[in-house]
Amino acid sequence: MRKTSHKKSRPTNNQKLATLKYTSHELQQWLLKTPSGREILRKERLFYMQNVQHSFGNYSLQIGLTEINLLQGNKIHNHYTVNLDIEADLHFMPFATESMDLIICPHVLEFIHDYEYVLQELYRILAPNGKIILTCFNQHSWFGLFSNKIALFKNARLIKLAKLKSQLEELNFGIAGGKFFSYCPPFNQARQFRRYRWLNKVGDRWFPTLANSFALILRKEVVTPTLIKPSSLESFQTLQPSLGTARICNKN
């Protein structure tokens, strides 16, 4: 049974659209021009490529980082991006229910007010057994520790993995896989950054949940009712007298 969550007031359409556009451009610049950003982009692009190439269906959607094609290599012919090909309010996306076979969300949740509603909308438009791949900056990391010193993160809400997994479970998403990326402090100088790359090997082995970013692969779990065969019904009917006897005995 699907659980319900407490609803909150939503921001206006203009606020949500403007916020996503502004942070998406900033994020792209940070990923391309900083040592930490370049490392994360390289690792996440590889992860996306490995996990979209075996996806099939009619429609795929990329939300965020629209200048970087992260759907490259998959077998789906019809691709959409937000906000490049279309302009969408992520709380009310202009797609039919259960129409998307693959959705990727590179660092979207951190920059959206009340991202819980976005998760609900993603669940609505995702086809049964469809796949979502999302990446998020981890609050329990170097990025979370120094978020007040990184301009990109000052207005962001870095994600707690445990809380996100709980929210996904409430929405009936199944987690099919995931990965952690980058354990280096966010140095501005490439030379300093290279000196601490050994933390990546140590982090993967000893403290993976403290990575600067993480990825999750989600599946839309659909419960299919099991039909009872006639022979099973006959077997069930033979139990009725004993069940009736049990009810009578309980009255005494």
Task: Please report, for each region that a protein language model flagged, where it lies by residue.
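A short glycine-rich, Lys/Arg-flanked "PGG" loop and its adjoining helix->strand segment in the class I
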Residues: 116-131
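Class I SAM-dependent methyltransferase SAM/SAH-binding core
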Residues: 46-96
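Acidic carboxylate diad motif detector
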Residues: 134-136
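Short alpha-helix
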Residues: 155-178, 182
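C-terminal lobe and adjacent flexible extensions of AdoMet/dcAdoMet transferase-like proteins
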Residues: 199-252
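Conserved catalytic loop of SAM-dependent methyltransferase domains
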Residues: 175-201, 209-211
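Short, glycine-/aromatic-enriched active-site segment of Class I SAM-dependent methyltransferases
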Residues: 138-155
